[in-house]
């Protein structure tokens, strides 16, 4: 913001000092302050604040066009912000290890690399030795119970196999934060159940903070510790709903009273915001 003094030589601008960064409450992993993003001159996010807790899965859900994917892309540094600040446990993004699972797995993998080399790619970028890479790859293969041939190229695999490999690659460097942008949107039901199970296993073993964008409310609630419900643009937080059913969650979870209540309340808030 600037103030203008109309003097004979034209306007004089004085920069207003940026307000001090206000940290989140204890247990916060990602702190967002004053986040602002414009598209075609219109605000998508304007002076947006959010605290994302550590060691939790937070699902992001909201109306079409509210900027769900844009939000996690800005947090992950894939989309520039116009103003604001984002810190990870008090650190900048460059000092934070992250993983990202893209919605379009067909474009996420390097087609000229074998699948096994795609998965190992972030480990090699870190400069890990061959022995370290081999050890971590063996852990991932065992964890995901991989049955398909990792020496094949991505385009030779099924959609579910490609997305499994994408998730393995995102988890390979053992990230502090894992971003998941509609990771189930192109998967069949059987593969969706498998990936849900594996993500929960990873979370229970590591406590990795996860941000999940989903267009499926049932899926968003099912995996979440918190459901972040967004408004229409300019986007605000409509409500953050806690959901605390024990893990691992299974198909039986879908009929539990607490799940049904949380899903119903989420739907009520969503419908209110869509009609706003």
What are the language-model segments listed below?
Residues 153-157, 161:
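Conserved ABC ATPase signature
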């Amino acid at each position: 913001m600037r103030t203008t003094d109309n003097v004979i030589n034209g306007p004089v601008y004085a920069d207003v000092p940026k307000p001090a960064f206000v940290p989140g409450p204890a247990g916060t992993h990602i702190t967002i302050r004053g986040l602002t993003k414009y598209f075609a001159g219109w605000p998508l996010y304007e002076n947006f604040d959010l605290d994302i807790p550590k060691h939790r899965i937070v699902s992001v859900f909201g109306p079409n066009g509210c900027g769900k994917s844009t939000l996690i892309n800005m947090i992950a540094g894939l989309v520039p912000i116009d103003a604001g600040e984002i810190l990870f446990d008090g650190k900048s993004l460059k000092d934070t290890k992250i993983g990202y699972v893209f919605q379009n797995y067909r474009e996420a993998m390097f087609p000229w690399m074998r699948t096994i080399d795609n998965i190992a790619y972030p480990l090699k970028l870190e400069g890990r030795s061959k022995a370290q890479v081999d050890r971590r790859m063996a852990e991932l293969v065992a964890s995901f119970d991989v049955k398909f041939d990792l020496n094949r190229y991505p385009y030779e695999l099924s959609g579910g196999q490609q997305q499994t490999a994408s998730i393995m690659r995102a988890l390979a460097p053992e990230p502090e934060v894992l971003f998941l942008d509609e990771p189930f949107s192109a998967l069949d039901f059987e593969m969706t159940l498998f990936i849900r199970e594996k993500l929960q296993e990873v979370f229970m073993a590591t406590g990795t903070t996860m941000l999940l964008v989903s267009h499926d409310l049932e899926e968003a609630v099912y995996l979440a510790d918190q459901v972040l419900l967004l408004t229409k643009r300019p986007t605000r937080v409509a409500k953050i709903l806690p959901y605390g059913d024990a893990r691992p969650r299974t198909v039986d979870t879908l009929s539990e009273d607490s799940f049904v209540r949380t899903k119903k309340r989420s739907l009520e808030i969503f419908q209110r915001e869509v009609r706003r």
